[in-house]
């Protein structure tokens, strides 16, 4: 199919057979899996997935691609295509033990990752191709430059595995940046205390609002220096020096 990639959807189509096989190996789809693909595009992953699965749900926003995907011989009786923007979908409607995969458009990857956390109780695992810089941010340890809001929120909810890099030449058209594959597995037994997720997201967003300022400055009016000291948290540190567990402590304190 001749399809002109649409900039507004951030479309770059995966072409490289070796990379496709490596992604499939990482996902390891089993026939009865409850699997959902976000942004199937021209079906580079969709077609080999359908060959292994009894059924696949896919969410695609592009009307031209919707028609193309439903007409694929391998789709017949197996592909449940949802014509929608993934940022508007209730993922829990597809049942429990959902396995989510996708080559996520660069322009919506961060908001989509945060959005998916709302449905984490329905999800078994997620495998995504993302801009390499985004995967580095997700996997970053505290005290590093890449560590930020995305690192805290995703590591609170999931075990993060940075799997491998994907070069620009694996795509058509070639993106200007490298990509990478990440596996996100929701914690079945969390290493962190349970906390109100909205409170955590709010405190993390405020803490990272100005990265060069100290935690005390960024959280002024929310928590005092003496209260931070009582929690054993150094208010003189910058936000990227505060661990996920410490952000959980802060969110818990504010919730109370």
Curated annotation (Swiss-Prot):
Its main location: cytoplasm. Gene3D superfamilies: Ribosomal RNA adenine dimethylase-like, domain 2, Vaccinia Virus protein VP39. It comes from the Bacteria. It is found in: Cytoplasm. It catalyses: adenosine(1518)/adenosine(1519) in 16S rRNA + 4 S-adenosyl-L-methionine = N(6)-dimethyladenosine(1518)/N(6)-dimethyladenosine(1519) in 16S rRNA + 4 S-adenosyl-L-homocysteine + 4 H(+). S-adenosyl-L-methionine binds at residues 12, 14, 39, 60, 85, 103. Coiled coil: none annotated. InterPro entries: KsgA/Erm, rRNA_Ade_diMease-like_C, rRNA_Ade_Mease_Trfase_CS, rRNA_Ade_methylase_Trfase_N, rRNA_adenine_dimethylase, SAM-dependent_MTases_sf. Its EC number is 2.1.1.182. One of its GO terms (molecular function) is RNA binding. The keyword rRNA processing applies. Keywords: Cytoplasm, Methyltransferase, RNA-binding, rRNA processing, S-adenosyl-L-methionine, Transferase. GO terms for cellular component: cytosol. Belongs to the class I-like SAM-binding methyltransferase superfamily. rRNA adenine N(6)-methyltransferase family. RsmA subfamily. Specifically dimethylates two adjacent adenosines (A1518 and A1519) in the loop of a conserved hairpin near the 3'-end of 16S rRNA in the 30S particle. May play a critical role in biogenesis of 30S subunits. This is Ribosomal RNA small subunit methyltransferase A. The gene is rsmA.
């Amino acid at each position: 199919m001749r399809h002109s990639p649409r900039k507004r959807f951030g479309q770059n189509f995966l072409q490289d057979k070796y990379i496709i096989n490596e992604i499939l190996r990482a996902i390891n789809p089993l026939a009865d899996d409850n699997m959902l693909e976000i942004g199937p595009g021209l079906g580079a992953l969709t077609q080999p997935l359908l060959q292994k699965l009894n059924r696949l749900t896919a969410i695609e926003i592009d009307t031209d691609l919707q028609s193309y995907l439903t007409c694929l011989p391998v789709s017949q009786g197996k592909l449940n295509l949802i014509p929608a923007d993934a940022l508007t979908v209730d993922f829990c409607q597809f049942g429990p033990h959902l396995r989510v995969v996708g080559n996520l458009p660069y322009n919506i990857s961060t908001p989509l990752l945060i959005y998916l956390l709302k449905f984490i109780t329905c999800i078994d695992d997620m495998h995504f191709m993302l801009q390499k810089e985004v995967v580095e941010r997700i996997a970053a340890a505290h005290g590093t430059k890449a560590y930020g809001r995305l690192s805290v929120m995703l590591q609170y909810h999931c075990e993060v595995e940075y799997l491998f890099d994907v070069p620009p030449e694996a795509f058509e058209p070639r993106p200007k940046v490298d990509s990478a594959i990440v596996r996100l597995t929701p914690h079945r037994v969390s290493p962190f205390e349970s906390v109100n997720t909205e409170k955590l997201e709010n405190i993390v967003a405020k803490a990272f609002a100005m990265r060069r300022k100290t935690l005390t400055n960024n959280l002024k009016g929310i928590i005092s220096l003496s209260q931070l000291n009582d929690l054993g948290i150094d208010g003189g540190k910058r936000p990227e020096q505060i661990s996920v567990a410490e952000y959980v402590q802060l969110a818990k304190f504010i919730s109370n």
